[in-house]
Amino acid sequence: MKSMLVVTISVWLILAPTSTWAVNTIIYNVGSTTISKYATFLDDLRNEAKDPNLKCYGIPMLPNTNSNPKYVLVELQGSNKKTITLMLRRNNLYVMGYSDPFDTSKCRYHIFNDISGTERQDVETTLCPNSNSRVSKNINYDSRYPTLESKVGVKSRSQVQLGIQILDSDIGKISGVTSFSEKTEAEFLLVAIQISEAARFKYIENQVKTNFNRAFNPNPKVLNLEETWGKISTAIHDAKNGVLPKPLELVDASGAKWIVLRVDEIKPDVALLNYVSGSCQTTYNQNAMFPQLIMSTYYNYMANLGDLFEEF
């Protein structure tokens, strides 16, 4: 089934608060997908989330917190017609909660406990607009990675298997199920959150594609990119003629230090930038980058040479 964009209209638009007007839903059929459909789904999500007027060095940027709509819904359709809908903040793609069809005709919503105030009300009314069929089953922990890892019972996300089949299986363990453990829910959430991470990073999208028909564990580069998205976004935004304001120390797939000096070194891995205020360059002269290329090679050589000597 082709990834589709569904615009929520009619009565919803009248009753919903201003902040959630015209919330859009991206639909992804996890149960019968292909690499091509997965790529289309992520493109749809990025296009829905990005600010069409903001780019740095050709990389789209997410909007600020004042932009409407404030949220994006992602409906995941699993095998056996089971579904779960994720609610994301548009300005950073953080997962705020999710809903699932429950007890034949009810909508059950689940919200992280670090979502509060107006946002919490928005999640409830956006995921389950009909108050007469709304059922609450809150997530009794916050959305931070360390908390989710603790609930799953692992020391690191590197121990959690990812993949399309894993996501499909996890949907079946949650959607419409009366009772499930915090461990089961946290396992689902850790995998589902990778949708946001893949939307942010082409590198993570490509990891999923490479391992499309099997489960896989995230490598050190995946984990590092997830933890430094804000820092990477700011560095690219503040770059002058493609040169970062200061060396950016990251980690490659093997776990070795990766020193980034130029936008074009990291650009192939990045699909969306976190919002950074102020203007930035949209293009740069590639021919002017040769000295920085030499310097970058030197930085990485020296950084990893130092690590090599530390082992003795």
Curated annotation (Swiss-Prot):
Residues 284-312 form a propeptide. InterPro entries: Ribosome-inact_prot_sf, Ribosome_inactivat_1/2, Ribosome_inactivat_prot, Ribosome_inactivat_prot_sub1, Ribosome_inactivat_prot_sub2. Its EC number is 3.2.2.22. It comes from the Eukaryota. Coiled coil: none annotated. It is an enzyme of class 3 (hydrolase). One of its GO terms (biological process) is negative regulation of translation. Disulfide bonds join 56-280, 107-128. GO terms for molecular function: hydrolase activity; rRNA N-glycosylase activity; toxin activity. Keywords: Disulfide bond, Hydrolase, Plant defense, Protein synthesis inhibitor, Signal, Toxin. Residues 1-22 form the signal peptide. It catalyses: Endohydrolysis of the N-glycosidic bond at one specific adenosine on the 28S rRNA. The active site is at residue 197. Belongs to the ribosome-inactivating protein family. Type 1 RIP subfamily. Inhibits protein synthesis in vitro. This is Heterotepalin-4. It comes from Phytolacca heterotepala.
